[in-house]
């Protein structure tokens, strides 16, 4: 080897090795201090990508486990409410068994019915007020989707059902032998709704029946329902030769076409006249199919096509025992109340009566208006409830309709109805119990998956302290040795001085 001064190759070689050992020492210290083998992508590019995917799955599955626990909580909340409803139903059944005994006086039956009513009202309260995090669990049919996985579509559904006295078929449960009908009407109350629709003005709409005589133009027929049959009370027939045509006619509905025809002669029938007043008219939250309602009103003989504001409302009455009896739906306008119906999809439509015009022979439709002239009796049945238009307690029915509970008879087979209600509650409780077990199984599986994924990720990105401590010790020794050797390598050029002496 040549003896040179300008270039100290041994020193450069030693410095290079010293830098390597220093880098190795830094890596070992970083891994020991962080606990991670991969602190950046340069440590292991492929391993970093794999570990990152594992982290996403682990975090998602951990949250999914919490979601499943929330699902258990909402199922338990619902089941707790159903348990209380079941307790009330058991008491109602006990009272129904007691009422079936002929030794009971009317006073005894009234007391039994009063408690039954209170129990049913409590069922309705539990149904309407039980909620979990703002979700009313028994107020309506609803499906809750619980995310129990880290990816799309990994869900479990909780099917909730509306459970109240009406859906249980017990809203008209009556074990009394009589039903008191009040002679005094109670004023209806209504709060304006923000959910309005545009429909034509419907003042003075009635079902008109044409006739071949001069008196036919003024004929009006008021539609009613009793014992499974429709009747039309005809008035306004002013032909002197045919005044006996005023009266009540049976109405027949054709099975194939749905057309309505009237009997040729009046019949004697006692239509419901006793009425209790509507005590509540509430806004219905259902979205209204305004276009369909408007078209139906026009087809029903609406005279004025100018737009008017109407609101879909639902009427109800609270009887002497405190039982809320639901009425039907109606459109409330400035002209009064008009019979309406709401299907399962939430669409509202006008209820109409079909009839055949005796003059033209054509089939027509007429809207059922809940109301009429002051003092005039006009009865319309909506969804099994009878509304009476007669003037009562000095109020005008045009503004405030009355609810006549004509079917105030003792419920047939009350125990059978209550048993069916209990079975309905039991079915929902069974579903909730099954879904809770399913959630528990999902949570166990999620826990196992998280553990296995965490172990797999650990093997990729966590530091092996035995290895890293060994690497650090080796690097430290190399650093010390390198430093010592570098000092000696730097002295090698001084050997040239001996040649210059």
From Swiss-Prot:
Gene Ontology cellular-component annotations: bacterial-type flagellum; extracellular region
Cellular compartment(s): Secreted; Bacterial flagellum
Keyword entries, A-Z: Bacterial flagellum, Secreted
Keyword Secreted among record annotations: yes
UniProt similarity note: Belongs to the bacterial flagellin family.
Other information: Individual Salmonella serotypes usually alternate between the production of 2 antigenic forms of flagella, termed phase 1 and phase 2, each specified by separate structural genes.
Protein name as it appears in the record: Flagellin
Lineage, highest ranks first: Bacteria, Pseudomonadati, Pseudomonadota, Gammaproteobacteria, Enterobacterales
């Amino acid at each position: 080897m040549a003896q040179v001064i300008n270039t100290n190759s041994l020193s450069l070689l030693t410095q290079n090795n010293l830098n390597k050992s220093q880098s190795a020492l830094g890596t070992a210290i970083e891994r020991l201090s962080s606990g991670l083998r991969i602190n950046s992508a340069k440590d292991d590019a492929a391993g970093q990508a794999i570990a990152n995917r594992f982290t996403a799955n682990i975090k998602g599955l951990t949250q999914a486990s919490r979601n499943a626990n929330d699902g258990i909580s909402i199922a338990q909340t619902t089941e707790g409410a159903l348990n209380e409803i079941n307790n009330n139903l058991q008491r109602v059944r006990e009272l129904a068994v007691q009422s079936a005994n002929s030794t009971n006086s009317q006073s005894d039956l009234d007391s039994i019915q009063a408690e039954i009513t209170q129990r049913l009202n409590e069922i309705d309260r539990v149904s309407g007020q039980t909620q979990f995090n703002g979700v009313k669990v028994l107020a309506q049919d609803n499906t809750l989707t619980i995310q129990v996985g880290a990816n799309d579509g990994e869900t479990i559904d909780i099917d909730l059902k509306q459970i109240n006295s009406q859906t249980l078929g017990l809203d008209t449960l009556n074990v009394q032998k009589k039903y008191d009908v009040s002679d005094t009407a109670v004023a209806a109350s209504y709060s304006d709704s923000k959910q309005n629709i545009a429909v034509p003005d419907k003042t003075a709409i009635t079902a008109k029946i044409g006739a071949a005589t001069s008196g036919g133009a003024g004929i009006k027929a008021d539609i009613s329902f009793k014992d499974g049959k429709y009747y039309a009370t005809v008035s306004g027939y002013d032909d002197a030769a045919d005044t006996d045509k005023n009266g009540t006619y049976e109405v027949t509905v054709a099975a194939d076409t749905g057309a309505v025809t009237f009997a040729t002669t009046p019949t004697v029938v006692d239509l419901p006249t006793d009425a209790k007043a509507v005590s509540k008219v509430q806004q219905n939250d259902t979205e209204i199919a305004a276009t369909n309602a408007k078209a139906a009103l026009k087809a029903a003989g609406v005279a004025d096509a100018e737009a008017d504001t109407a609101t879909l409302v639902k009427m109800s009455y609270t009887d002497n025992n405190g039982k809320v009896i639901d009425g039907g739906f109606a459109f409330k306008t400035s002209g009064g109340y008009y019979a309406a119906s709401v299907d399962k999809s939430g669409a509202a439509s006008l209820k109409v009566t079909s009839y055949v015009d005796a003059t033209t022979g054509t089939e027509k439709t007429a809207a059922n208006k809940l109301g009429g002239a002051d003092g005039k009796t006009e009865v319309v049945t909506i969804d099994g409830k009878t509304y009476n238009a007669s003037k009562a307690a000095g109020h005008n029915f045009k503004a405030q309709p009355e609810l006549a509970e004509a079917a105030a008879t003792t419920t047939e087979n009350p125990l059978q109805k209550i048993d069916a209600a209990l079975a309905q509650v039991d079915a929902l409780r069974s579903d909730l119990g099954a879904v809770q077990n399913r959630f528990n199984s999902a949570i166990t599986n999620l826990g196992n998956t998280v553990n296995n994924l965490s172990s797999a990720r650990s093997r990729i990105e966590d530091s092996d302290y035995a290895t890293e401590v060994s690497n650090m010790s080796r690097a430290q020794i190399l650093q010390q040795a390198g430093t010592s050797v570098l000092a000696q390598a730097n002295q090698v050029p001084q050997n040239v001085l001996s040649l210059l002496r």
